[in-house]
Structure formats: structure tokens, C-alpha cells
């Protein structure tokens, strides 16, 4: 399988390139970056100390021309432009970008009628196992427990709460038969009154180089259960993303998530 990487000069992009180079059965077909990036024209492996023979380019269609799949962990506006080009050229996509609004998510669903797309809040196998644990815990602790989601990321993350935190909230809300749009509480300040027992709270921390910490607290009277996942590097995300690309090899179209890739549905 020939894989192209978007955001090739970024932290996640470099790790994805390295993962592709180290994975049997796949090859690096292209490396994409934004116009004006100082990395344009450089070998995609330069920052890894390796030569790939693939130059970083800002020409989306040229990069996709030799690719079977594009892996994209960038920003919503860039990803949506890449989706349009991928749909035109019949190139599949693995999307780890977070922060989409409802219109953006609808655009991904529409594109998935024509091409295979894996769109997930988190590509870590451990995080996806955590989603299943939360589903079970929410059903067992459906009454008498207050639910709070606490997440922490590095200072450069631009969206909050994280896509993973929101997915955790969705998993819990679905297990409880609730709608996260109506039961989520994203901020508390001043005189808030008593906590609504049916709400799901979110707290966000941003600082330093935290890769990603997520904890869900089920707080009852006399006890508290906490389910946590902490990432020490982005390696698990890169591994999962390449695994997702290979999953798409025989999928002509459709919208999938990491639970599909791992056979957890």
C-alpha cells in the first residue's frame, strides 16, 4: 500500500513518516505540507536522519497521484481541502484531525460515500480499549455517580476539550441513553448551584509538552472510580494510524472508526 502523509514537517507528521518507513507492506508515496513551509522541497526523511527519495510538497493533487491512502493529522480547514482532493482522485483517508464542527463532520460523511475513510478521535489501541471500559463502567454505575472527564495536553493544542475527551463523553452518554449535546457541562465559574446529577462534566488543562492524559471519574458517595489513560509519546497514534490505513485496503468506500479497525464493534 502506498501512503502519503499530510503535515509532513510537524511532530505527528514526522512520526507517521517514520512509522510508514518501518512497517512492512507499506511505502511512503508522498509528503504534504502547507504552502510557505520551510520544509518544502526537502527529503521527507531529512529530520529523521534518513533519505526517502520523497520530497515534501504543497501540491495536494501531485502528492495524492501516487498514493492509495492519505494519513492526515492536521487542522480541520486543511483536512477538508485534502478530503475534497482525495475524493476527486479516489484516494482513501485516515483522519486524526480533531476540532471539526458539525458541517465538517457532515462533509467527511459525504466524502465517505465515494472513498474509504477512517475518522477517529484517537488511534491508540489503549485509548480504544479505554472506550470499551468506560461503556461497561457507565452501565454499571448509571445511578448515584457523578461523571467528570479531565484531560490534559501540551500548550500548543488549539482545540478544547480534546477529541478524545469528547469521544469518552459520547461513549458514556450513549451507554446511559443520554445526548451529550444536552448533558455536557464545559465550564464552571461563580455561583453555579448544585450539580445536575445527569450532567457529564469536562475539565481541560493545557501546559508544557503533555502528550495526552485522560481520566474519567465516577464519583459516588463513599467511593470514587477513576479510569485513566496517559500517553508518553505519539508512537501509539502513529502505529494505529498505519494500521487503519491497511484496514482500508479492501474498503472501496465507507466511514469507519478505530473500533472498526480493532474489531471492537
UniProtKB/Swiss-Prot annotation:
Catalytic activity: (S)-2,3,4,5-tetrahydrodipicolinate + NAD(+) + H2O = (2S,4S)-4-hydroxy-2,3,4,5-tetrahydrodipicolinate + NADH + H(+); (S)-2,3,4,5-tetrahydrodipicolinate + NADP(+) + H2O = (2S,4S)-4-hydroxy-2,3,4,5-tetrahydrodipicolinate + NADPH + H(+)
Residues forming the catalytic site: 153, 157
Annotated GO biological process: diaminopimelate biosynthetic process; lysine biosynthetic process via diaminopimelate
One Pfam family here: DapB_C
GO CC terms: cytosol
Pathway: Amino-acid biosynthesis; L-lysine biosynthesis via DAP pathway; (S)-tetrahydrodipicolinate from L-aspartate: step 4/4
Class of the enzyme per the UniProt entry, highest EC level: oxidoreductase
Enzyme Commission number: 1.17.1.8
Residues the record lists as binding (S)-2,3,4,5-tetrahydrodipicolinate: 154, 163-164
Keyword vocabulary terms for this entry: Amino-acid biosynthesis, Cytoplasm, Diaminopimelate biosynthesis, Lysine biosynthesis, NAD, NADP, Oxidoreductase
Compartment(s): Cytoplasm
InterPro entries: DapB_C (IPR022663), DapB_N (IPR000846), DapB_N_CS (IPR022664), DHDPR_bac (IPR023940), NAD(P)-bd_dom_sf (IPR036291)
Binding site for NAD(+): 7-12, 33, 96-98, 120-123
Record GO terms (molecular function): 4-hydroxy-tetrahydrodipicolinate reductase; NAD binding; NADP binding; oxidoreductase activity, acting on CH or CH2 groups, NAD or NADP as acceptor
Family statement drawn from the similarity comment of this UniProt entry: Belongs to the DapB family.
Stated name of the protein: 4-hydroxy-tetrahydrodipicolinate reductase
Species of the source: Cupriavidus necator (strain ATCC 17699 / DSM 428 / KCTC 22496 / NCIMB 10442 / H16 / Stanier 337) (Ralstonia eutropha)
Lineage of origin: Bacteria, Pseudomonadati, Pseudomonadota, Betaproteobacteria, Burkholderiales
Amino acid at each position: 500500500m502506498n501512503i502519503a502523509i499530510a503535515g509532513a514537517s510537524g511532530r505527528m507528521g514526522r512520526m507517521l513518516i517514520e512509522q510508514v518507513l518501518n512497517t512492512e507492506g507499506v511505502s511512503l508515496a508522498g509528503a504534504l505540507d502547507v504552502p510557505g513551509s520551510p520544509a518544502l522541497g526537502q527529503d521527507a526523511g531529512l529530520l529523521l536522519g534518513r533519505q526517502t527519495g520523497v520530497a515534501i510538497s504543497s501540491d495536494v493533487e501531485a502528492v495524492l497521484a501516487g498514493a492509495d491512502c492519505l494519513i492526515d493529522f492536521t487542522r480541520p480547514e486543511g483536512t477538508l481541502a485534502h478530503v475534497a482532493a482525495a475524493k476527486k482522485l479516489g484516494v482513501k483517508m485516515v483522519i486524526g484531525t480533531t476540532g471539526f464542527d458539525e458541517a465538517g463532520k457532515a462533509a467527511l460523511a459525504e466524502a465517505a460515500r465515494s472513498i474509504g475513510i477512517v475518522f477517529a478521535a484517537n488511534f491508540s489501541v489503549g485509548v480504544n480499549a479505554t472506550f470499551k471500559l468506560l461503556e461497561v463502567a457507565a452501565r454499571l454505575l448509571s445511578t448515584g455517580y457523578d461523571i467528570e472527564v479531565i484531560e490534559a495536553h501540551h500548550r500548543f493544542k488549539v482545540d478544547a476539550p480534546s477529541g478524545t475527551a469528547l469521544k469518552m463523553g459520547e461513549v458514556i452518554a450513549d451507554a446511559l441513553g443520554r445526548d451529550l449535546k444536552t448533558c455536557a457541562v464545559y465550564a464552571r465559574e461563580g455561583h453555579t448551584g448544585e450539580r445536575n446529577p445527569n450532567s457529564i462534566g469536562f475539565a481541560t488543562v493545557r501546559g508544557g509538552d503533555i502528550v495526552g492524559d485522560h481520566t474519567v471519574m465516577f464519583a459516588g458517595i463513599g467511593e470514587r472510580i477513576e479510569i485513566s489513560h496517559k500517553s508518553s509519546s505519539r508512537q501509539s497514534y502513529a502505529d494505529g494510524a498505519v494500521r487503519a490505513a491497511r484496514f482500508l485496503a479492501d474498503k472501496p468506500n465507507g466511514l469507519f472508526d478505530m473500533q472498526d479497525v480493532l474489531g471492537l464493534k
